[in-house]
Amino acid sequence: MPAPPEFLSWVDASKDAFIARLSHAVSIPSISGDPAYRPRVQEMSDWLNSELKKVGVETKQVDLGNHVMDGQTLPLPNAILGKIGNDKNKKTVLIYGHFDVQPAALSDGWASEPFVLTTLPDGRLVGRGSSDDKGPVLGWLAVLQWHHETQTPLPVNLRFCFEGMEENGSEGLDELVESEREGWFGGVDCMCISDNYWLNTRTPALTYGLRGLVYFKINVSGPGRDLHSGVFGRTVHEPMTDLISLLSRLVDAQGRILVPGVDDMVSAAGVEERSIYEKLDYSIADVEGAAGGQ
């Protein structure tokens, strides 16, 4: 469904206001991985909650409790749940995003102050969180603002889940999702994660699938004391070489997973999906550029 022309005109006319709002968001150093900045993460939660209410979203800030970091017991920043629309004839879409950021300083190689939104000569805006993930979150806010100001009905019901710990392991999120599965998340038909990347800097991209993560822990035991390799080498098993042998059986030199049955669990790309790939604005040069290749 294409965007209404009047919406696009409104976006153009509201450009300065959007940039000012993003500039304010970027100026809040909501660094979740540094205890000293925990109050600023909560400040970001409070500000975003207020902005959502202004455009008609019913919100709830959720106390996620405390956690221990660097030997300190700290309060987790409040997550924000939001809802707008409850039409049983419409689909319900859950929007996820986060308002915390990674640390940033000029000494890290930034050409400008990271927490000051800066306009480059080519028109691009640079600032910590401008793309990951405050910019995308504020994009939703802009859409809601237009619908609110023009009283244009939304085509779907929306639910929101915005957190302030994504850059630090999303502590508290699992418990929140479980506790609200029949509450704020009840009746959700699909989900949009507003925290992803374009394939390049030229063409907007919609990501419709993500790889999952599986973590395993293995302990390899060896001799009960430090042994001299000149005496015990090749006589007693060395834990390091045993571990190397084990890990070498998981993948081959091309990165193919060697665990039996794993590939059988992956759905094959259909004709329609392959046709989408063939039309993507994506090339080997894009891969090399993103990886820092020469």
Q: Which role does the model predict for each range below?
A:
Residues 27, 53, 149-152, 181-182, ...:
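Generic secondary-structure signature for well-ordered alpha-helical cores
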Residues 113-114, 207-219:
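Flexible glycine-/small-residue-enriched beta->alpha junction loops
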Residues 124-125, 129-209:
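Acidic/histidine-rich catalytic neighborhood of metal-dependent amide-processing enzymes
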Residues 125-127, 224-230:
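Short small-residue beta-strand/loop micro-motif enriched in glycine and branched aliphatics
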Residues 183, 199, 208, 215, ...:
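Acidic-enriched catalytic cores of C-N bond-cleaving enzymes acting on peptides and small amides
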